[in-house]
Amino acid sequence: MTLTLRLDPEELMQVFDLYLAACDDIVSEHGGRVMQYMGDGVLAYFGYKQAQASDAANAVRAAIAIRDALGRLLLPAGISLRSRIGVATGLVVVNERAGRGDGRGNGIVGETPHMAARLQTVAKPDMVVVADATRCLAEGPFTYRALGTFRLSGFPTPVTAFEAV
């Protein structure tokens, strides 16, 4: 049963506030920025405005930290949150809203956010799934388990995916 059916609106907002605050804090701590909230989804990016060699590793670290933090949130009795996270690496175009200047704009354009969203659909609960390019750039600090190749909607060739463990 979904949270919207199990919780009254005030409790639901408290859970969402805790979840989104945790995501915001963790992404920021790892050098990233949250671009958009999409329902219970969070779109974050690393390497804006200045790309660093550590961006892919920081993104994977943040994803693992979010997955782990959800189990530690103080939620109403009987409520637990599970995550499915996709991480992809590549070029994007950032669309900032005029005057904001903080990097949270109307969105990002490019193959990379679509890849991350599609990889999320491959993930099982509490799994961080990364694209091969991300794995290659963030190879040292993590252990990966090959998940295989997948035909992802919108991508002409199969995509190789890995679980960050």
What positions do the PLM features span?
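Cytosolic regulatory/linker segments at or just downstream of nucleotide-handling modules
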Residues: G90-V94, G107, A116, T121-V165
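Nucleotide phosphate-binding site architecture
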Residues: M1, M13, L43-A44, V93-V94, ...
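Structural preference for long, well-ordered alpha-helical segments in enzyme cores
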Residues: Y19-A22, I26, A59-A69, T112-L119, ...
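Helical mechanochemical/support elements of P-loop NTPase systems and associated helical scaffolds
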Residues: L12, Y19, M38, D55, ...
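Conserved long alpha-helical elements within nucleotide-processing catalytic cores of c-di-GMP signaling
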Residues: M1-D24, S28, M35-Q36
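Catalytic core of nucleotidyl cyclases, primarily class III adenylyl/guanylyl cyclases
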Residues: I26-N58, L70-T112, V159-F162
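Conserved NTP-handling cores and scaffolds of large molecular machines
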Residues: T4-L7, V27, R67-A77, Q120-M127, ...
